[in-house]
């Protein structure tokens, strides 16, 4: 990609952007993982969790959420100023599950946010360790991406629910920084911008005054983030138009939706990182593993090796299939919600099925669910091969795709053709090429028309045996091309709504 040299790698984003060499980056990411692990161990001690209970993914999610809430300054300020009945703004908590007399019990715990912040800082050598917090946010985001299809959110902003492959990171909080921005899909950025423009249309003062200046700054920053994800000059030029608009309105919304559609074929660069639950890092640190000394990368073999040697458990509802629950979490751990299922099946070594075929609901258990019938089982998170995560969209290519999802967003840098349903996508581009962006629109449509089905992406890249740590022998997988490639096919996924 042409601008690769000017972009910071996402390890640099993880490490506040100093230019570092690979060893320093690995140590720095390792230090972040150590901090999460130490914090988790301490929380398990505070909560008096057994080893098994500490490896329960539902407990991990509650503990992660508590620390994220303790450090959410804007929300904390908001809660102080708008006290609501029954919510103590200084406290945070959630459900903790314990095994009592052969049954799973739910216990609601409550802690001072100040106390949680103290434990977190202590585990991170006195630092706020924002990177560790962002890491947990991205893990939650990846889990949401795998569990829910954002149909309603897409429709609300005027987009087509079949564009779900563009929605990576759509539930990431705004405060997730540069590392968060790197993993957001094109559709996510478009949705954030459209929401902003709609507020401006409905509220005359949105862009005015001191606040309006800040808002405008945020708008232009978001436009630049989105522009940086596009890989063609015409798409970028259109983003300049949207950014420079005096008074963003419906024309800009149209342009953004056009760009989002175009990204189904002319895919943007979206980073992928394997962010694992805290209950994976905790036991590894407890066993004496020193991530900072050994070094760690979110985009190489390390997360695969860690998952090969981890025991993670999950609560299972009466009519859920534990193997399906495992697939859900495995995909989330590998940031692969929108990847081609044929490739995922190859890497995992077992068949990866579309979301609608899985007999499993989300990982979290609602407070009104009956605990008497809950069982627990081991999550199978191991893989047959490993592959390098990508931060490019690959180049384009066409293949029959499904009703539920009409394109993919690659997560792994592995040679294959990238399926997308060209006729369905192109049908959306009827006629509308007038107006100030007409030449760019025409150019974009021309490039999309030219996308060839036989084109191969990531040429020469393969997957690797788990013993091949230095990635010396790439294995290029071969696929049955007639097979279904998309995860949200047909779509029975539940809706994600906060």
UniProtKB/Swiss-Prot annotation:
Residue window of motif Bipartite nuclear localization signal: 198-216
Presence of keyword Metal-binding: no
One BP annotation, GO: viral penetration into host nucleus
Bias (Basic and acidic residues) ranges: 8-21
UniProt-annotated stretches for the region Disordered: 1-21
Domain of life: Viruses
Membrane-spanning ranges: none
Sorted UniProt keywords: Capsid protein, Helical capsid protein, Host nucleus, Host-virus interaction, Ribonucleoprotein, RNA-binding, Viral nucleoprotein, Viral penetration into host nucleus, Virion, Virus entry into host cell
Motif segment (Unconventional nuclear localization signal): 1-18
Subcellular location, record wording: Virion; Host nucleus
GO CC, any one term: helical viral capsid
Record-linked SUPFAM superfamilies: flu NP-like
A Pfam family annotated for this UniProt entry: Flu_NP
Molecular-function annotations in GO: RNA binding; structural molecule activity
PTM annotation, UniProt: Late in virus-infected cells, may be cleaved from a 56-kDa protein to a 53-kDa protein by a cellular caspase. This cleavage might be a marker for the onset of apoptosis in infected cells or have a specific function in virus host interaction.
Family from the record: Belongs to the influenza viruses nucleoprotein family.
Subunit and partners: Homomultimerizes to form the nucleocapsid. May bind host exportin-1/XPO1. Binds to viral genomic RNA. Protein-RNA contacts are mediated by a combination of electrostatic interactions between positively charged residues and the phosphate backbone and planar interactions between aromatic side chains and bases.
Annotated HAMAP family: INFV_NCAP
Function according to Swiss-Prot or TrEMBL: Encapsidates the negative strand viral RNA, protecting it from nucleases. The encapsidated genomic RNA is termed the ribonucleoprotein (RNP) and serves as template for transcription and replication. The RNP needs to be localized in the host nucleus to start an infectious cycle, but is too large to diffuse through the nuclear pore complex. NP comprises at least 2 nuclear localization signals that are responsible for the active RNP import into the nucleus through cellular importin alpha/beta pathway.
Stated name of the protein: Nucleoprotein
Organism: Influenza A virus (strain A/Memphis/1/1973 H3N2)
Gene behind the chain: NP
């Amino acid at each position: 990609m042409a601008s690769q040299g000017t972009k910071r790698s996402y390890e640099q984003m993880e490490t506040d952007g100093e230019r570092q060499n690979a060893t320093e980056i690995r140590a720095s990411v390792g230090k972040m993982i150590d901090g999460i692990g130490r914090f988790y161990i301490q929380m398990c001690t505070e909560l008096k969790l057994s080893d098994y209970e500490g490896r329960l993914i539902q407990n991990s999610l509650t503990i992660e959420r508590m620390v994220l809430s303790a450090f959410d300054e804007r929300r904390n300020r908001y809660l102080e100023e708008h006290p609501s009945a029954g919510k103590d703004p200084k406290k945070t908590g959630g459900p903790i599950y314990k095994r009592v007399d052969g049954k799973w019990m739910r216990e609601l715990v409550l802690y001072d946010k100040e106390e949680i912040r103290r434990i977190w800082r202590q585990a991170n050598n006195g630092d706020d360790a924002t990177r560790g917090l962002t890491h947990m946010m991205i893990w939650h985001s990846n889990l949401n991406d795998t569990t829910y299809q954002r149909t309603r959110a897409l429709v609300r902003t005027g987009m087509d629910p079949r564009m779900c492959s563009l929605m990576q990171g759509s539930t990431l909080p705004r405060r997730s920084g540069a590392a968060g921005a790197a993993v957001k899909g094109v559709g996510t950025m478009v949705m954030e911008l459209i929401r902003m423009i709609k507020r401006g249309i409905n509220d005359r003062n949105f862009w005015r005054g001191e606040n309006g200046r800040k808002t405008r700054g945020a708008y232009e920053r978001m436009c630049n983030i989105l522009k940086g994800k596009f890989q063609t000059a015409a798409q970028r030029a259109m983003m300049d138009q949207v950014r420079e608009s005096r008074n963003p309105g419906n024309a800009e919304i149209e342009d953004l939706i056009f760009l989002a559609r175009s990204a189904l074929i002319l895919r943007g660069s979206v980073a992928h990182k394997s962010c694992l639950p805290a209950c994976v890092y905790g036991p590894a640190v407890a066993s004496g593993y020193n991530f900072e000394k050994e070094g760690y990368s979110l985009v190489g073999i390390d997360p695969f090796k860690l998952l090969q040697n981890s025991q993670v458990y999950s609560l299972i509802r009466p009519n859920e299939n534990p193997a399906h629950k495992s697939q859900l979490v495995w995909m989330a751990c590998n940031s692969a919600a929108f990847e081609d299922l044929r490739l995922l099946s190859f890497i995992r070594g077992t068949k990866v099925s579309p979301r609608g075929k899985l007999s499993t609901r989300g990982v979290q258990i609602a407070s009104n669910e009956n605990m008497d019938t809950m069982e627990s089982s081991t999550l199978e998170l191991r893989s047959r091969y490993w592959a390098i995560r990508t931060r490019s969209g690959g180049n384009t290519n066409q293949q029959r795709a499904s009703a539920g999802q009409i394109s993919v967003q690659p997560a792994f840098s592995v040679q294959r053709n990238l399926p997308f349903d060209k006729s369905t996508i192109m049908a959306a581009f009827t006629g509308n090429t007038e107006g100030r962006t007409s030449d760019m629109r025409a150019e974009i449509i021309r490039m999309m028309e030219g996308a060839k089905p036989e084109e191969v992406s990531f040429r020469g890249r393969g997957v690797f045996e788990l013993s091949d740590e230095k990635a010396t022998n790439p294995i290029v997988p071969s696929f049955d091309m007639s097979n279904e490639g998309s995860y949200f096919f047909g779509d029975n996924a539940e809706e994600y709504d906060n």
